[in-house]
């Protein structure tokens, strides 16, 4: 079995750092989208690796690694990076789900636009608006620095040769995936409740006054009220999204601890 000789250690350590960072970058919204060229992602990952490498080299000392272990370590670094990016993606996906739910209720369900931030697929108009709002908050607040801090702290605790993913980690990710629907419901529930109440009122009016044309009058009313509720709800959307991003630091630390103590 071939063994990596000592003069290759520096290259292998840098390579493992790079793979963890690049895997996280390609998962992150906007930065990881197809709108950003591949060379820019690779360049950013390379630059971040150059910064991280001298800071952690003293704490990450690689043993003699056979080639199969190097390959397994690369795969594990990619998985760790994907998991970190996934924690951020959960919030943006939850925001997109909220937009889809709102669009259906306010009559915009048939209007779709390309979403370059996450999936590069057609999503509803409201989903696009909320995703751009989330991106602005992500950039304007310290959320992006939470991501950088989280991936840096992971190098302090999670070894570059880490390959043991325990069931605790996957259970944690399963629970976090449920946050997509939680965020979507919490963001959209005020407008959904108003839309349901408005539909009930319009239905009662059609029942009481049969000459009342529900489709000619009711549909425009739903759209106008929906737009008004969207405008009124912007501060609520902003506060909730900011609260979700503020929890990233805690989630990164929780993931690092789970990996360190149960890995």
Regions of interest found by a model, annotated:
Residues 1-263:
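Hydrophobic alpha-helical segments and their helix-loop boundaries in membrane
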């Amino acid at each position: 079995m071939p063994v990596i000789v000592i003069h290759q250690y520096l290259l292998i350590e840098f390579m493992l750092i790079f793979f963890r960072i690049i895997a996280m970058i390609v998962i992150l919204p906007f930065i990881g989208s197809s709108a950003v060229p591949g060379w820019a992602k690779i360049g950013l990952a390379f630059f971040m690796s150059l910064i991280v490498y001298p800071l952690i080299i003293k704490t990450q000392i690689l043993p003699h690694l056979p080639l199969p272990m190097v390959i397994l370590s690369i795969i594990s670094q990619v998985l760790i990076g994907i998991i970190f990016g996934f924690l951020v993606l959960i919030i943006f996906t939850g925001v997109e789900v909220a937009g889809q739910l709102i669009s259906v209720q306010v009559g915009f369900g048939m209007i779709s636009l390309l979403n370059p931030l996450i999936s590069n697929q057609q999503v509803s108009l409201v989903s696009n608006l909320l995703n751009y709002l989330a991106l602005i908050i992500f950039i304007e607040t310290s959320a992006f620095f939470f991501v950088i801090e989280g991936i840096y702290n992971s190098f302090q605790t999670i070894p570059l040769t880490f390959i043991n993913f325990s069931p605790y980690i996957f259970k944690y990710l399963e629970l976090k995936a449920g946050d997509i629907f939680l965020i979507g419901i919490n963001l959209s529930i005020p407008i959904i409740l108003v839309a349901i109440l408005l539909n009930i009122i319009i239905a009662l009016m059609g029942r009481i006054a049969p000459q009342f044309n529900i489709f000619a009058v009711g549909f425009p009313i739903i759209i106008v009220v929906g737009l008004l509720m969207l405008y009124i709800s912007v501060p609520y959307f902003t506060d909730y999204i900011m609260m979700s991003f503020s929890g990233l630091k805690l989630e990164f630390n929780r993931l690092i601890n789970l990996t360190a103590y149960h890995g």
